[in-house]
Amino acid sequence: MIKLQKLKLYGFNNLTKSLSFCIYDICYANTNDSRNSYISYIDEQYNAIRLTKILKKTCSIIGANVLNIFHQDYEPQGASVTILVCEEPMSMEKIDALNKNIVSSSVLAHLDKSHICVHTYPESHPQSGICTFRADIEVSTCGIISPLNALNYLIHQLESDIVTIEYRVRGFTRDIHGIKHFIDHKINSIQNFMSDDIKSMYDMVDVNVYQENIFHTRMLLREFNLKNYLFNINLENLEKEERSYIMKLLSKEMREIYYGRNISR
């Protein structure tokens, strides 16, 4: 991350930095049984235990200390994981709810600001045969910890067809002279922090609001191999016309999600 000239702050760095992902995995399944199997498969692939491991690794990468972990698998499908984090290591006495109801103020300062969470949403539609899996991830920190340090790791771990990313810096912090600072590092695009291999894999477009410190990037996987999008279907068993139909169906679905609107054809 490119930092601005080093500042001497008055007190704690109160800037809140939030990195939000919305990732999509798309496939085609031509029977009800196949669609149900896909939902079960993807639900297991992204179960709460695996997601917890990914988020704990994320904490390690950004240098955050774990305060508390909550994870849950839902019926019939879906999972959630939430991890509360802080900048400095905490002794158990400071975060123990049974410690005469005395909780360190530094812990309270982080409970509403510094967290990492993920929620999953598998779904399908019987008429089209399209199945989608969506996961929402948010890494929100305050202090010197930057969620952008985990950007490449999370993209690689989730291996998605479509990704929308938003990075926001909120609030302000003061230096020792009382001057407010609304951001503490240079950025003009989330793409600045992506590795070259990720940039080569995706087509990307930015929608940024610089004056509000809001940065938005949409990503669409460049390589389209129909075989990778068929669930319980052998590509060799499909007629040319059927292959063409499925490719158009998948392409339309992916473009609609990428652009965030319905496309008539």
Curated annotation (Swiss-Prot):
Its cofactor is pyruvate. Coiled coil: none annotated. It comes from the Bacteria. Binds 1 pyruvoyl group covalently per subunit. The active site is at residues 114, 119, 142. Is synthesized initially as an inactive proenzyme. Formation of the active enzyme involves a self-maturation process in which the active site pyruvoyl group is generated from an internal serine residue via an autocatalytic post-translational modification. Two non-identical subunits are generated from the proenzyme in this reaction, and the pyruvate is formed at the N-terminus of the alpha chain, which is derived from the carboxyl end of the proenzyme. The record marks 113-114 as: Cleavage (non-hydrolytic). GO terms for molecular function: adenosylmethionine decarboxylase activity. Disulfide bonds: none annotated. One of its GO terms (biological process) is spermidine biosynthetic process. It is an enzyme of class 4 (lyase). InterPro entries: AdoMetDC_fam_prok (IPR003826), S-AdoMet_deCO2ase_bac (IPR009165), S-AdoMet_deCO2ase_core (IPR016067). The keyword Protein biosynthesis does not apply. One of its GO terms (cellular component) is cytosol. Pathway: Amine and polyamine biosynthesis; S-adenosylmethioninamine biosynthesis; S-adenosylmethioninamine from S-adenosyl-L-methionine: step 1/1. The keyword Membrane does not apply. It catalyses: S-adenosyl-L-methionine + H(+) = S-adenosyl 3-(methylsulfanyl)propylamine + CO2. Its EC number is 4.1.1.50. The modification Pyruvic acid (Ser) is found at residue 114. Keywords: Autocatalytic cleavage, Decarboxylase, Lyase, Polyamine biosynthesis, Pyruvate, S-adenosyl-L-methionine, Schiff base, Spermidine biosynthesis, Zymogen. HAMAP family: AdoMetDC_2 (MF_00465). Catalyzes the decarboxylation of S-adenosylmethionine to S-adenosylmethioninamine (dcAdoMet), the propylamine donor required for the synthesis of the polyamines spermine and spermidine from the diamine putrescine. NCBIfam families: SAM_DCase_Eco. Heterooctamer of four alpha and four beta chains arranged as a tetramer of alpha/beta heterodimers. Belongs to the prokaryotic AdoMetDC family. Type 2 subfamily. This is S-adenosylmethionine decarboxylase proenzyme. It comes from Buchnera aphidicola subsp. Acyrthosiphon pisum (strain Tuc7). The gene is speD.
